[in-house]
A protein has these predicted regions:
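An N-terminal assembly and electron-transfer interface module characteristic of large anaerobic redox
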Residues: 1-191
Length: 191
């Protein structure tokens, strides 16, 4: 997203270099939100809207986990030109770039030299369950949501979405619970 226009792209393969100009990004400091291409996009979009409401440009970048994420971060300045990265918000869990690309991504983040924040999509608990819990995050998720990202300098974890209400799928009859953005938490992270 940039200047109120939808600015998203799925990153995969080699054809996405110099995407910033294609998306109409300006030569200005830009906050980047990195998420998975196969995840819900409402949370990343809501975060970009909140950042833009504060007068900063924002772009949501969606890539596959592993090699595509490593490539995106290694080439981020060229990818987003003419925009200049000002901060990065990572919504991916585990380590960006997977085990094979962890060190390369860590080096790319060091070269970027921008603050890197961790946004958490809580898929096990609703907003109410999360707020009433004694532990915040389920203990078995702290490793991949907080500890592993911290190995790469991705810190200040912040929950920005939680499990939404059950909705019946018309085709299968299954009750599906998708993540739902938490507006107050998104505003906190954006500030």
């Amino acid at each position: 997203r940039s200047q109120g226009r939808e600015q998203r792209a799925e990153l995969s393969g080699e054809g996405w270099l110099r995407l910033g100009a294609t998306l109409g990004l300006r030569a200005a400091p830009t906050v980047l939100v990195l998420d998975l291409a196969n995840a819900e996009t409402d949370s990343a979009d809501a975060l970009c809207r909140a950042i833009e409401a504060r007068g900063l440009a924002c772009a949501a970048l969606f890539s596959r986990w592993g090699g595509a994420s490593r490539q995106a971060l290694e080439q981020l300045p060229a990818l987003l030109a003419p925009a200049q990265p000002a901060a990065l918000v990572v919504m991916q869990d585990f380590v960006v770039g997977a085990a094979d690309g962890r060190e390369a991504v860590s080096a790319a983040l060091t070269r970027l030299n921008v603050p890197v924040f961790k946004a958490i999509r809580l898929t096990e608990r609703s907003q109410t369950q999360w707020r009433l819990s004694s532990d915040g995050l389920p203990a078995d998720s702290v490793q991949y949501r907080v500890a592993l990202p911290e190995l790469q300098g991705i810190g200040q974890p912040h929950v920005i979405s939680a499990l939404g209400p059950a909705q019946r799928d018309a085709a299968t009859g299954l009750a599906l619970r998708r993540p739902q953005a938490l507006p107050a938490e998104i505003q906190r992270l954006a500030s």
